[in-house]
Amino acid sequence: MTLTDLETCAEEIATAARTLARDGHSGGYSAGLPDHLRAVQRTLIANASQVLALASQPADLVRQLALYNQLLACLRWLGEFQVLACIPLDESVPFEDVADIAGVPECRLRRLVRPLFTIGFLCEPSPGHVAHSVLSKQFVTQPALLDAILFMSETLAPSASAMGTQTRRFGASEQAGDSAWNMAVGSDSPFAACLQQRPKVKRQLGAYLSYVSSAIDAGVEDTLTRMNWQNLGMATVVHVGAQSPSLVVALAPQFPSLRFLVQTEAKAESGGHQPCLDNHGIPALKLASIPLHLRARITWGTRLSTATQPVLDAAVYLISIPFPSPQSPAMEITMRVAQALKAHVEVLRNNSDARLILTLPMSSATRSMDAAARAAVSLSDLSLLQLTNGGSLNMGEIRDLLRSRSDGLVVMREVRSPTNAVIAFEIQYRVDNDDNRY
């Protein structure tokens, strides 16, 4: 990066900061961010990261790593003793009272929370008293945040530290039982077995992956907005295999003429009970995540992953493939892609105007990606390596799978933004599918 790049970054930071300031959130955005400002926030953070990289000296890097290492340790300590839950959400209390409730020495409590004040986590509004900040309060109201922290400190950090031992013993082994995690815990069983036996670790892993992959999720939205949605008119878009309504909630305001169906995988509920549904067919527990003004355009449905697509009149069938994880290795995801294509052959054959849009995360970071996207790809890849010796998706295999089909499905074009970590394939049914269109 040159000095000219530094000036450009500074100008973009100033522009983004003014936009955020105009929104009127004087207390910051730790409690959440309006959807229309998320892109602005990403721009601000990406440019700030670039400035930090240019202006920092080697000693600054050492200090930063030392600080975050200690901050992670402090947060783990708070989590182990449930200290955050011992502090009222809206008032300050003496350190002594919190220490008594948590059952920890007051002197330790004081020393371990004060480093967190430097990042706006907790605060000391008056001498001898501690209170929640806007940031720390979220770790009480959103337990998944603390789950992610505990997974990093209890599971991932020891595994990362054991990479040298793993390499000396197993080299470049791809066997799940030869991972750095196995070295760290002294077990011969693969990490997947741990997830089956320890629901808490499985829950923590899910929380960690959801936050680490958020930049990839944002990339899906960014890439999809580059598709030609405006010409669809008053059409239906089916989000196939959705884990949540978050993607359609992000797309719906941008395309007000479209209706969306969130199609989850059908699963038998334990005890034979089905989830409570509202009048749009949406599970009541997930209804709250859909803004009131969008609920009339978003409905819910289910389908077995092996079943033929039953929705016959949609204009777009959207399939978002996640980054491989300890629970879903790359080979399984590749098989899922093949299964999804097979399930949609008939519906696309009967409606040649319909499209299937397949989005996948890039298998490796590129120089053109923004800092958040590069970090998301790298963190996801390293986590997979350390926990299972697993690898990323083989994009060559995916492209071969798409090109070699003889069932009439043809890739019409390939779309991606150079700054994010997502690629999209637009697929239609064509009789003359001797070659692909992109």
From Swiss-Prot:
Q: Name one GO cellular component term.
A: nucleus
Asked whether the UniProt record includes rRNA processing among its keywords, one would answer no
**Localization of this protein:** Nucleus; Endosome
The induction text for this entry reads: Expression is positively regulated by the developmental and secondary metabolism regulator veA. Expression is repressed during Streptomyces-Aspergillus interactions.
Portion annotated as DNA-binding: 95-114
What main location does UniProt list? Answer: nucleus
Q: What does this protein do?
A: Transcription coactivator involved in regulation of the aflatoxin biosynthesis gene cluster with aflR. The ratio of the expression data between aflS:aflR plays a crucial role in the regulation of aflatoxins production. A high ratio, produced at a range between 17 and 30 degrees Celsius, corresponds with the production profile of aflatoxin G1 biosynthesis. A low ratio, produced over 30 degrees Celsius, is related to aflatoxin B1 biosynthesis.
Q: What is this protein called?
A: Aflatoxin cluster transcriptional coactivator aflS
Which species is listed as the source?
Answer: Aspergillus parasiticus (strain ATCC 56775 / NRRL 5862 / SRRC 143 / SU-1)
